[in-house]
Amino acid sequence: MDKKHTRRKKISDNAKATLLRWWIVGMCYFMIGFGTQAGGYTSPIDLIFFLGVGIGLVTIVVYNPIAYNVFDIVRGGEIVNHRYRNKKGWQRALQTLGDLGLSMLVVILVYLSYQNINLFLVGLLGLSPETVVVAGEPFGFATLYTLFYSAITGLTDKLRAIRTGSATV
């Protein structure tokens, strides 16, 4: 019997970093959405605010040091780790504010996605407007968050490349 030696494909560092972000965001949603009173309030603004700030802080304190010091993150053919490592104090402060703002923006986009999905399904199924067909949960939230985050960072990288003149658009 011939034994075939198969070579496993190596998972790229970008995929590992994305999976790490997905896991961290899901964990934050689980802790904040289910473990605090913000998840039970009738006003979604509290949940959006605390999720945005919480995910932003965990990104700054946990994700960025791990992702940019362990993985080689490649965007547009360039390893972008040096953008994180070689920053001065004021640039780190701006990046911190940017990470918080981006987290808030992405959480708002995910919330609006859930709202629109539910409104569509309520109209399609003829249910009462107060019915929540698709409730928030960590897996779906983290998946939508990661998709929106990747789209926004891809767009900002394209805009940065166009601005510096190194774009192949």
Name these PLM-found stretches.
Residues 1-78, 134-142:
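N-terminal first transmembrane alpha-helix
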Residues 9-22, 85-110:
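Loop-to-transmembrane boundary segments
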Residues 12, 16, 91-94, 98, ...:
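Residue-level detector of alpha-helical secondary structure
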Residues 31-35, 102-127:
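Alpha-helical transmembrane segments and their membrane-interface junctions
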Residues 45-53, 97-100, 116, 120-136, ...:
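Extended non-catalytic scaffold regions that mediate assembly and binding
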Residues 61-69, 108, 112, 116, ...:
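Transmembrane alpha-helix boundary/anchor motif
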Residues 69-77, 143-169:
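Cytosolic juxtamembrane helix at the C-terminal end of the final transmembrane segment
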Residues 74-90:
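Membrane-interfacial, low-structure loops and terminal tails that flank and connect transmembrane helices
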